[in-house]
Design a protein with these regions (language model features):
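Bacterial N-terminal signal peptides
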Residues: 8-19
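Positively charged, low-complexity intrinsically disordered regions
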Residues: 3, 20-22
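An exposed, glycine/acidic-rich loop-and-rim segment of catalytic or binding clefts
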Residues: 23-52, 58-279
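Bacterial N-terminal signal peptides that target proteins for export
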Residues: 1-8
Length: 279
């Protein structure tokens, strides 16, 4: 029996409306870098008529760059990334990567499914983090350009065989990045498995709306439309509780600067920053 899962993430960034007509939607691809064995890592660049530009590479189905113009028309790269493959291969921060099979941490690298216990490799002290030491972020994905009437995009595909990193089932995963003229970058996931498995896909981009390298984000303001969050323990493992954000540093229901929340006195902040857990 095949099982299909289709989550999606939408990202909308407001930028200056430059005087360029709708025909400005375009895409191109080339070589980003090469592996030691000579395998090419491709890059796909998506552009719209507003001056926004997203670059995705096939290593880890990674969002490598996202140029967004400000109200004066000056474009800044608002996500953190590397200019060559070496940084992604040696790095441990998962910059911009597609995370799988299982995002976040599995305590002791263990889980049970349908009465059977599974052990996956540890890569975060006593935890398995973001799919293990060779998760989706370390794989070369196949890519193809996709276009429709209102957007331009790239679809990346990876097949994880049964038992890879200890996870059951052969899993075919597709990640599609698309950009439209409303300055919306959309990430859509589609996965099919041939037997029951666990799956928690996400994108691991780090944002600085002032532009990469332009200071910290403590004065930047965020809104998260969620009334509950998932507390974690000292090992950053979710406790299973769905706690109310009201009265905690995790409350971003109304616009608030990150710096204000980070400086609050709360037990959760002894373990991680306010947005380390889930909402």
């Amino acid at each position: 029996m095949r099982k299909t899962l289709i989550p999606a993430i939408g990202l909308s960034l407001m930028a200056a409306a430059l005087q360029v007509h709708a025909a400005g939607l375009s895409s191109e691809h080339g070589v980003f870098d090469k592996l030691a064995d000579g395998t090419a890592v491709e890059k796909y660049t998506l552009r719209n008529s507003q001056g926004m530009q997203a670059t995705v590479i096939t290593y880890g189905a990674t969002l490598q760059s996202l140029l967004v113009p400000d109200k004066h028309g000056k474009a800044e790269d608002v996500v953190l990334g590397f200019d060559d493959l070496d940084g992604y291969q040696k790095g441990t921060a998962f910059f911009g990567a597609t995370i799988g099979r299982f995002g976040n941490r599995l305590a002791d690298g263990k889980f049970s499914l349908d009465g059977k216990s599974y052990q996956v490799p540890l890569n975060d002290k006593t935890n398995a983090l973001h799919g293990g030491p060779k998760g989706f972020d370390k794989q070369i994905w196949k890519a193809e350009e996709v276009k429709d009437k209102g957007s331009v995009g790239v679809k990346l595909t990876y097949v994880s065989v049964d038992g890879e990193m200890g996870f059951p089932g052969t899993l075919k995963t597709e990640v599609t990045y698309s950009l439209n003229d409303k300055n919306e970058l959309r990430i859509q996931y589609h996965a099919t498995t041939d037997k029951p498995t666990v799956l928690n896909l996400t994108n691991h981009s780090y944002f600085n709306l002032a532009g990469a390298g332009n200071g910290d984000i403590l004065d930047q303001v965020a809104v998260v439309h969620a009334s509950r969050y998932t507390p974690v323990n000292e090992k950053l493992i979710p406790t299973g509780e769905l706690a109310a954000v009201a009265g905690t540093p995790m409350d971003f229901l109304k616009p608030v600067a990150f710096g204000k929340r980070i400086r609050e006195d709360n037990t959760q902040l002894k373990f991680a920053e306010p947005t380390q857990g889930g909402y």
